[in-house]
């Protein structure tokens, strides 16, 4: 099947943790991996294009979401699949066309830079060295954090194994009651420490992306005087470079996260085994506890050895991409397959635009047509306000009536007093 690599991509998505929603990046990754696995030749890609397979891969992203009552995911899936298959077909057909456009663009840029070939090569070389200087502190920090966090993880987990061995010796008659809380705590501690490890390590990828933007912008300014009227085409090439370099940063983050999840999957069964062995005999449990500390140390050390070189390998990849740019812009450039990065960038931009438009429309629809329970709630509030207004009006009317009655009583009293005065006046005379 063409999609073995895509299946691995979906598995990686599952390993790194399900998100609240299917993201544009996940969809774009599935589509690009599918296209890459078909063929690097556009004609062959069109001939072997099987929409049903791409549809299956996209639907797989929604399986967990549709298990819930999730109207948003269902609507997104209905609109996304036709859009994605159409975009994919157009992608395959436009590949050769884009390749020719990029070739012509490079030829024009090279022609403009040719009289200054030595200066351009020197500027790119200086930029490479500046990039290395920018990244080196962060690479060192990443390596230090890997060592620090793994050592902290080891220190956090090892005492649980030692404590459980001690409890086993002291409470042989009540193993389940005594050891189960410690086994549960070990499981919780594994989850907590792996999450903290990811939170400490993955932000470095974002720092790298900031430095990449700075480096590419400085390179653009340094080459601008030599580009003359080909500046726009040079900028386009630099955009492709920045896209590829930042893609490496995203892949670095994904690899760190995936390695941390793999560590969790290796450590979690150790705690589960302890809980399972509580129902067995004391001798088997004692053997498992004796081996627990060694298993913890080995898995943590394997993680450290695997992740420690990630930063250095990332730096090497960026330097290599800068050198490839120098080769593409040089006078002796060969047939460089540079169009694929632009093709992927275009795909991701279109998928992001689709998601943004869909979410904006969804938000507008929700504003114009509220869900039925919310409509009922608003109607109830309006009715309550009307009732309160009516009650207030009734109270005001009652107050007015009382005031009128009081005024009438006062007037009657005044009239009676005047009549009494008039009746007494003749007697006094």
Swiss-Prot record:
Name the UniProt record assigns to this protein: Apolipoprotein A-IV
PANTHER family: APOLIPOPROTEIN (PTHR18976), APOLIPOPROTEIN A-IV (PTHR18976:SF1)
Keyword Acyltransferase: no
Quaternary assembly: Homodimer.
Residue ranges, compositional bias (Low complexity): 381-420
Residues in Sequence repeats: 33-54, 60-81, 82-103, 115-136, 137-158, 159-180, 181-202, 203-224, 225-246, 247-268, 269-286, 287-308, 309-330
Localisation per UniProt entry: Secreted
Organism name: Macaca fascicularis (Crab-eating macaque)
Function: May have a role in chylomicrons and VLDL secretion and catabolism. Required for efficient activation of lipoprotein lipase by ApoC-II; potent activator of LCAT. Apoa-IV is a major component of HDL and chylomicrons.
GO annotation, cellular component aspect: chylomicron; extracellular vesicle; high-density lipoprotein particle; low-density lipoprotein particle; very-low-density lipoprotein particle
Pfam families: Apolipoprotein
Gene name of the record: APOA4
Keyword set includes Coiled coil: no
């Amino acid at each position: 099947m063409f999609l073995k690599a895509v299946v691995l991509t979906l598995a990686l998505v599952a390993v790194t943790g399900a998100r609240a929603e299917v993201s544009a990046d996940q969809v774009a990754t599935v589509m690009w991996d599918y296209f890459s696995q078909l063929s690097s030749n556009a004609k062959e890609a069109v001939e072997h294009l099987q929409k049903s397979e791409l549809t299956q891969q996209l639907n797989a992203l929604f399986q967990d979401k549709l298990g819930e009552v999730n109207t948003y995911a269902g609507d997104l899936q209905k609109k996304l699949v036709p859009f994605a298959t159409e975009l994919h077909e157009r992608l395959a057909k436009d590949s050769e066309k884009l390749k020719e456009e990029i070739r012509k663009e490079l030829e024009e840029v090279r022609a403009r830079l040719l009289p200054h070939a030595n200066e351009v090569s020197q500027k790119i070389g200086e930029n490479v060295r500046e990039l290395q200087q920018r990244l080196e502190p962060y690479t060192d920090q990443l390596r230090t954090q890997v060592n620090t966090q793994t050592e902290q993880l080891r220190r956090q987990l090892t005492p649980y194994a030692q404590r459980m061995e001690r409890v086993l010796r002291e409470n042989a008659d009540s193993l389940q009651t005594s050891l189960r809380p410690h086994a549960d705590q070990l499981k919780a501690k594994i989850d907590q420490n792996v999450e903290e490890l990811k939170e400490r390590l993955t932000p470095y990828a974002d720092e790298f992306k900031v430095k990449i933007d700075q480096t590419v912008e400085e390179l653009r300014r340094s080459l601008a005087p030599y580009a003359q009227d080909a500046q726009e085409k040079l900028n386009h090439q630099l955009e492709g470079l920045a896209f590829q370099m930042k893609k490496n940063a995203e892949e670095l983050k994904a690899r760190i996260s995936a390695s941390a999840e793999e560590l969790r999957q290796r450590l979690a069964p150790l705690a589960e085994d302890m809980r399972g062995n509580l129902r067995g005999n004391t001798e088997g449990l004692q053997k498992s506890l004796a081996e627990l500390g060694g298993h913890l140390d080995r898995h943590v050390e394997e993680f450290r050895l695997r992740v420690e070189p990630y930063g250095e390998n990332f730096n090497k990849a960026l330097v290599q991409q800068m050198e490839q740019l120098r080769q593409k812009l040089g006078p002796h450039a060969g047939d460089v397959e540079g169009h694929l990065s632009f093709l992927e960038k275009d795909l991701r931009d279109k998928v992001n635009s689709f998601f943004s438009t869909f979410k904006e429309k969804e938000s507008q629809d929700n504003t114009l047509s509220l869900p039925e329970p919310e409509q009922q709630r608003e109607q109830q509030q309006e009715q309550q306000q009307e009732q309160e207004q009516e009650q207030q009006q009734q109270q005001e009317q009652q107050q007015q009536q009382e005031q009128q009655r009081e005024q009438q009583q006062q007037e009657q009293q005044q009239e009676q007093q005047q009549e009494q005065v008039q009746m007494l006046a003749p007697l006094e005379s």
